[in-house]
Every structure is written in C-alpha cells, then in structure tokens.
C-alpha cells in the first residue's frame, strides 16, 4: 500500500466495504480517530489544562478515577453517539451500557473502549493510551442489552489503540493486518506510517510486574526463572525485562520490536486483572493479526466467552514462540 500521505479517512474508504454497514464502520473509526486526537491534546496539556489529579470519583472497577479518565470517557461517547454508526457503547469507566439519545438512529455496530489505559501514569508524565473494539450489533434496531455485548473476541470486526507518547500513534486492524497512523498535530490529521506490522516470532524480552512474584502461578514462576538464568539456563539466551505499567505503552513496544507481555491470574486475583471486553479482546485481535499469539492461561484469548461486561482474565501475549512455551508450561502443571 502506498503510504505517501495516506490519511486515516482515505485508508478507511479503501479498506471498508462500500455497503451500508461498511460505510458506518468507516465513519465510526473516523469518529474514534477524532476523539483520540482530542484526548491527545488534553493529555499533552496536562496541568496547564487542569487535567492532572483525581476526579473524586470511583469507577465500577472500584478504582479512583483521574480527571483525564472522565474527560476521555466523555469525549469518546460524545464523539461516537451520532451518525447512525453504533447501536450502543460500553466503557471500562461505566457501570452499564451507554444507550444512544432518543432520536439518534441505531447503527450496525457496538463500540467498547478503555478510554484512558494506564491513567495512574498521567501525573508522572508516562505514556498512556486508549483501547477500542468494534463488535456487530443485533440486527433488530433495538437498544442493546448486556448479552449483545458478551461476544468472544473472534467476533470483533475492528480493534485498535492510540498511544499518547512522544508522538501520538493510532494502531488499527480491520482483520487484514495491523496498520499504524501518526498524528500530524499541525494538520490535525492521522497519516499512515506503518503497514502490515509484524511481531517477530522470537524474542529475548519480557514485560511483567515482578512485585507479584510471590503469588504467581507455577508456570509463570518457571518461565521467568528460566528467562533470568540467561545463557547458562534451559533457554540458552539472555533475556531483558521491561515494565512501564501502562498496557498500551508496553504492548506498543512489543508490536514495534517484539517481546511477550504477561499479566497472569494469580493467588490474589484468580480471575485475573485485565478486562476481557475492553483490553484483552482488542489487544489479542491486534496481536494475532500481527503474527503473535494471545493466551489466557486456559485457552486462546479470542475464544474466551465473556459472561459479564466487566469480566477479567489473565493474559499472556506477544511473540509466537514465547507464548507457545507458556502454553506448554500451563499444560504441564
């Protein structure tokens, strides 16, 4: 694909089907892109826009919300609740499904999102991001109910994230490869900068929060110990550890240069910590489209059948060979 000044809008016009649903999908993803641009401006402004610090609210997860969590959530809802693109939305920050205002046409898609992943890093100026997923809506034209959103990840038609770092990058898949767009702040436009991104099959880098080591399951303890044994150990090579504590930032590094990201279920959180609908499903779709794998500790991540809007699970994803090693260790336990 010719990347010479390919805008997000032009890309979507070429890649989405030209029927009614395809045009609605293209518009929805442009709406998401516009919303992420607004969020990027707010993140960059930080304290100058009074966007740092807590919002004095607690979300459905029991987590203290940051001011930017609330702002990003509102921006995505306001940016995508018009134009007949969605039948409804769900957010990590909301208790229930968002129902469209009366009079707005119900569209063919459902939008699910984590409006600001890694928001605990905002006040220390570390990269954060937005994660999103698109699922088919019921064909009835009615407002969706919870069960309509409880679809396994392999039913996603699109997924992506925006990372708000030194540059702002939007990474997207429509089920035919992974593409990255960089925001030109001067023009306020997303331009294609990477096509058909691939995660290397082999790696010598892992990302995990080692503060949970005492409560890790046996397969994770074994895997990390063998990585740390270096050339003298059973893996026969030296591994490096990376951990940013921002899923989008950690995985963007892996999409760019390889690695494996581990956030397993453990003794304290036997059901895991990551949200299936808002984090695991979209990131797993992107990872498989980039040639990697995603595994929950029990099954392929995209085959997990969610049973609740805010269900959690463990997750290991990244370079194919490392995820296969982890699959084997879990099978042997």
From Swiss-Prot:
UniProt: Mg(2+) 1 binding residues: 92, 114, 116
Cofactor binding, note field: Binds 2 magnesium ions per subunit.
Name of one Pfam family that matches: FBPase
GO biological process: fructose 1,6-bisphosphate metabolic process; fructose 6-phosphate metabolic process; fructose metabolic process; gluconeogenesis; sucrose biosynthetic process
Swiss-Prot/TrEMBL cofactor(s): Mg(2+)
UniProt pathway: Carbohydrate biosynthesis; gluconeogenesis
Reaction(s) catalysed (UniProt annotation): beta-D-fructose 1,6-bisphosphate + H2O = beta-D-fructose 6-phosphate + phosphate
Subcellular location field: Cytoplasm
Protein residues bound to Mg(2+) 2: 114, 117, 279
EC primary class: hydrolase
GO function term, MF aspect, one: magnesium ion binding
InterPro entries assigned: FBPase_C_dom (IPR044015), FBPase_class-1 (IPR000146), FBPase_N (IPR033391), FBPtase (IPR028343), Fructose_bisphosphatase_AS (IPR020548)
CDD domains: FBPase
EC id: 3.1.3.11
UniProt keyword annotations, A-Z: Carbohydrate metabolism, Cytoplasm, Hydrolase, Magnesium, Metal-binding
Binding site for substrate: 117-120, 209
Cellular component terms per the entry's GO annotation: cytosol
Gene3D superfamilies in UniProt: 3.40.190.80, Fructose-1,6-Bisphosphatase, subunit A, domain 1
Assembly mode: Homotetramer.
NCBIfam families: PRK09293.1-3 (NF006779), PRK09293.1-4 (NF006780)
Family membership: Belongs to the FBPase class 1 family.
Protein name (database record): Fructose-1,6-bisphosphatase class 1
Species, as recorded: Alkalilimnicola ehrlichii (strain ATCC BAA-1101 / DSM 17681 / MLHE-1)
Gene that produces this protein: fbp
């Amino acid at each position: 694909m010719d990347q010479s000044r390919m805008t997000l809008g032009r890309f979507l016009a070429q890649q989405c089907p030209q029927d009614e649903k395809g045009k609605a999908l293209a518009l929805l993803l442009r709406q998401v892109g516009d919303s992420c641009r607004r969020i990027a401006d707010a993140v960059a402004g930080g304290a100058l826009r009074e966007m740092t610090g807590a919002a004095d609210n607690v979300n459905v997860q029991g987590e203290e919300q940051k001011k930017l969590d609330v702002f990003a959530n509102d921006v995505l809802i306001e940016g995508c609740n018009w134009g007949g693109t969605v039948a409804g939305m769900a957010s990590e920050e909301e208790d229930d499904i968002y129902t469209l205002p009366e009079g707005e046409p119900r569209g063919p898609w459902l939008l699910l999102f984590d409006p600001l992943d890694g928001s605990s890093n905002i006040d220390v100026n570390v990269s954060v991001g937005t994660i999103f997923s698109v699922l088919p809506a019921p064909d009835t034209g009615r407002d969706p109910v919870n069960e309509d959103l409880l679809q396994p990840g392999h039913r996603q038609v699109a997924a992506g994230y925006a990372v708000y770092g030194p540059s702002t990058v939007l990474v997207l898949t429509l089920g035919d490869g992974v593409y990255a767009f960089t925001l030109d702040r001067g023009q306020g436009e997303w331009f294609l900068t990477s096509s058909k991104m691939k995660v290397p099959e082999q790696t010598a880098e892992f990302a995990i929060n080692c503060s949970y080591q005492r409560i890790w399951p046996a397969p994770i303890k074994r895997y990390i110990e063998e990585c740390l044994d270096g050339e003298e150990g059973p893996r026969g090579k030296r591994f490096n550890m990376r951990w940013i504590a921002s899923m989008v930032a950690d995985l963007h590094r892996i999409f760019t240069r390889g690695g494996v990201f581990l956030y397993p279920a453990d003794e304290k959180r036997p059901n895991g910590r990551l949200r299936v609908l808002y984090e695991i499903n979209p990131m797993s779709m992107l990872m498989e489209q980039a040639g990697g794998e995603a595994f929950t500790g029990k099954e392929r991540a995209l085959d997990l059948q969610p049973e609740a809007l805010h269900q959690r699970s463990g997750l290991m994803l990244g370079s194919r060979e490392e995820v296969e090693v982890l699959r084997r260790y879990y099978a042997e336990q």
